[in-house]
Amino acid sequence: MAKLYFNYSTMNAGKSTMLLQASYNYQERGMRTVQLIAAFDERAGRGVIGSRIGLEASAIPFEPDEDLFRLVMTLSGEGAPISCVFVDEAHFMTPLHVWQLARIVDRLGIPVMVYGLRTDFQGKLFPASQELLAIADEMREVRTICHCGRKATMVVRLDAQGKVLHEGAQIDVGGNEKYVSLCRRHWDDEMNGAWIAEPV
């Protein structure tokens, strides 16, 4: 039975690497996959999913107003059946895109695996991630670690001088030079200043 999977994490956890490996596993067995990425995310090139360890694969770039259900329905009528749809950087989608992916699962019977961030640098849910948390059939946390060794669940955004930013647009495409993954405690220290408990 097809399902909508949300694989979420903070930055630098290996989500894109996992996506590329999972898609390759299908392809190695002669199955067809469709890989999607937001058109404005050109870090690895337009229509390219790239990982920090150097793996890359071509993907179909989609625009904010694109109907992903219609796109996949059209593709499914061309060539071999589609065995799975993969979406990288899912937080760049709109909530409507999430529902279109759910329709791919429910109406076309094609599994959809999405990979993305849960929260932004201010600790707020991305709209698409919020929608995925609400309607995905299965959610899987992809883990990475803070510099202290604890599980990293948050991310801070840095300016060109490496200082932590507290304000700005929710979406700002960047990589290791712009974002650092931290545990909640160290994120709080960076965003709100080192907190010292008052004596009881």
Swiss-Prot record:
Main location, first listed in the record: cytoplasm
Pfam families: TK
Gene3D superfamilies: 3.30.60.20, P-loop containing nucleotide triphosphate hydrolases (3.40.50.300)
Gene Ontology MF: a single term: ATP binding
Catalysed transformations (reactions): thymidine + ATP = dTMP + ADP + H(+)
One GO term of the biological process aspect: DNA biosynthetic process
Origin: domain of life: Bacteria
GO cellular component: cytosol
Family the UniProt entry places it in: Belongs to the thymidine kinase family.
The UniProt record lists the keyword 4Fe-4S: no
Active-site residues from the entry: 89 (proton acceptor)
Subunit structure: Homotetramer.
Metal-binding as UniProt keyword: yes
Organism (species): Rhizobium etli (strain ATCC 51251 / DSM 11541 / JCM 21823 / NBRC 15573 / CFN 42)
Residues binding ATP: 9-16, 88-91
Identification of the protein by name: Thymidine kinase
EC numbers: 2.7.1.21
Chain positions recorded as Zn(2+) binding sites: 146, 148, 183, 186
Keywords for the protein's UniProt record, in alphabetical order: ATP-binding, Cytoplasm, DNA synthesis, Kinase, Metal-binding, Nucleotide-binding, Transferase, Zinc
Subcellular location: Cytoplasm
